[in-house]
């Protein structure tokens, strides 16, 4: 049986890998959950007639080039959109297709480019309508779906804050202010590291200039204390943060807003890599990530990782990782000479090193303060699926819980349909702070990774 490589995830990494394979005449299957490829970075507007000019000329050029390259290789890429991989093992995947039919799909090689999800940071009022995660709001703007009405406030930490503020304003949204939790001096200390990517550094300065020119205030060392409103968001309380992100409540002030977008970084989606039994480790920030080598190979050599699965470093790094993974697959299939594969890999790795140095600087200045876990009050819901509060978690800690598995058993946190995607970040942070240990475990995924209808089992079969 002549099996094909399978790529899970049609974002930057998955598309780059598929293009690389296709250019060598190797056909592949590419699965993506969305209705068009591109991922969060390059999906573009979902509706016809939407002009993405507000996202910037350089972004538009990169989007158009990626689409042209992908279209040119379409004859070798079996693109399966609106399809979810809900489980798998070392030889096959379980896929729910667009018609909600379940299939087993076997593969010769597998590339996991499943991306990431946003880190949720609970605080009083974070479940109010009008409060949303920053990446989700940006995706709505990029997709041309909907724009928030009224005043929008942006809070959190990282380079995504000013970027989204500029994109929102350019799209016609009223941005009331941007609140960056880290102090300006902390960011300035990383200037040399940030200069490893001069264009991105200049883009950052340009965004700051845009905000100033358009009268959008940017507050360093400030963050959210509480969101409030009767049934929906009407007001956000912000305050100065100290180095540990402890809010100075004496100097807190209310800000009127109908939308609050909060962004505190991302966590790789490791549900499938865990089901496949790959080796994992923990990042400095405490999240679980699958391990890979310089060929993007996991602990199982025919399974590769790219994009956020291999480290959260942005779209450019994701594409480089996808290309390296494709070179490894081509090498294993004897579709490329070893010397050429190594030469091209080294060229890609040289570019990747500069990105890694840049990202290391970003990670240092955006490192979350230890007191962030104390923003939530005793009655603040942490696990939205099971309505587990911070008080429930604190009682479990008092009773001697030492790891994620114990916390899940004691409180039901992480037992809902999202399988902990919303609460795992907080639970891990709180356990690490309480126990003083870096490794407190992680939530083990169940099959299926996503909910599926019973009707999906009617036509279950195996597809090569």
Curated annotation (Swiss-Prot):
It holds the Pfam family Fer2_BFD. Induction: Reduced oxygen levels. Its main location: membrane. It catalyses: glycine + 2 A = hydrogen cyanide + 2 AH2 + CO2. GO terms for cellular component: plasma membrane. GO terms for molecular function: glycine dehydrogenase (cyanide-forming) activity. Not stable at 0 degrees Celsius. Decrease in activity up to 40% immediately after freeze-drying procedure, with a further decrease up to 10% when stored at -10 degrees Celsius. Oxygen is necessary for cyanogenesis. Activated by succinate, glycine methyl ester, glucose and D,L-methionine in addition to glycine. Phenazine methosulfate, methylene blue, 2,6-dichlorophenolindophenol (DCIP) and ferricyanide can replace oxygen for the reaction. Inhibited by pyrrolnitrin and acriflavine at 1 mM concentration. Signal peptide: none annotated. Its EC number is 1.4.99.5. It is found in: Cell membrane. Keywords: Cell membrane, Membrane, Oxidoreductase. Optimum pH is 8.3 (in the presence of Tris-HCl). Active from 7.3-7.8 in the presence of other buffers. It is an enzyme of class 1 (oxidoreductase). A three-component membrane-bound flavoenzyme that catalyzes the formation of hydrogen cyanide, a secondary metabolite, by transfer of electrons to a cyanide-resistant branch of the aerobic respiratory chain. PANTHER family: ANAEROBIC GLYCEROL-3-PHOSPHATE DEHYDROGENASE SUBUNIT B. Heterotrimer of HcnA, HcnB and HcnC. This is Hydrogen cyanide synthase subunit HcnB. The lineage of its organism: Bacteria, Pseudomonadati, Pseudomonadota, Gammaproteobacteria, Pseudomonadales.
């Amino acid at each position: 049986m002549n099996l094909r490589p399978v790529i899970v995830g049609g974002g930057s990494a998955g598309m780059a890998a598929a293009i690389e394979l296709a250019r060598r005449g190797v056909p592949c299957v590419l699965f993506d959950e969305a209705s068009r490829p591109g991922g969060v970075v390059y999906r573009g507007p979902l509706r016809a007639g939407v002009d993405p000019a507000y996202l910037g000329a350089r972004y538009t050029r990169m989007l158009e080039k990626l689409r042209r390259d992908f279209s040119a290789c379409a004859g070798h890429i079996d693109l399966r959109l609106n399809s979810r991989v809900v489980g798998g093992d070392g030889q096959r995947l379980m896929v729910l297709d667009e018609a909600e039919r379940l299939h087993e799909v076997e593969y010769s090689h597998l590339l996991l480019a499943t991306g990431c999800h946003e880190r949720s940071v609970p605080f009083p009022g974070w479940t109010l309508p009008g409060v949303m995660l920053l990446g989700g709001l940006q995706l709505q703007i990029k997709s041309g779906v909907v724009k928030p009405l009224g005043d929008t406030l942006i809070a959190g930490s990282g380079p995504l804050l000013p970027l989204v503020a500029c994109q929102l304003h350019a799209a016609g949204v009223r941005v009331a202010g941007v609140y960056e939790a880290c102090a300006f001096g902390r960011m300035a200390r990383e200037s040399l590291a940030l200069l490893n990517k001069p264009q991105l550094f200049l883009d950052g300065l340009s965004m700051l200039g845009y905000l100033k020119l358009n009268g959008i205030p940017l507050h360093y060392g400030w963050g959210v204390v509480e969101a409030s409103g009767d049934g929906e968001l009407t007001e956000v309380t912000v305050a100065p943060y100290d180095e540990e992100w402890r809010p100075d409540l004496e100097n807190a002030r209310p800000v009127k807003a109908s939308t609050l977008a909060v962004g505190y970084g991302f966590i790789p989606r490791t549900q499938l890599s865990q089901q496949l039994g790959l080796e994992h480790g923990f990042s400095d920030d405490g999240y679980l990530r699958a391990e890979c080598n310089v060929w993007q190979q996991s602990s199982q050599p025919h399974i590769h990782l790219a994009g956020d699965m291999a480290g959260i470093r942005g779209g450019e790094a994701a594409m480089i990782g996808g290309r390296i993974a494709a070179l490894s697959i081509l090498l294993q299939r004897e579709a490329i000479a070893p010397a050429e594969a190594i030469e091209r890999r080294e060229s890609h790795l040289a570019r990747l090193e500069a990105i890694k140095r840049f990202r290391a600087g970003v990670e240092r200045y955006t490192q979350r303060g230890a007191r962030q876990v104390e923003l939530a009050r005793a009655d603040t819901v942490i696990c939205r699926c099971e309505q587990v509060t911070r008080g429930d978690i604190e009682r479990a800690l008092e009773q001697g819980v030492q790891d994620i598995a114990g916390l899940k058993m004691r409180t039901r946190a992480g037992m809902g349909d999202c399988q902990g995607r919303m609460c795992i970040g907080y639970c891990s942070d709180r356990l690490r702070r309480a126990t003083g240990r870096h490794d407190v475990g992680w939530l083990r995924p169940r099959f299926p990774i996503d909910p599926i209808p019973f009707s999906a089992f009617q036509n279950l079969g195996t597809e090569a």
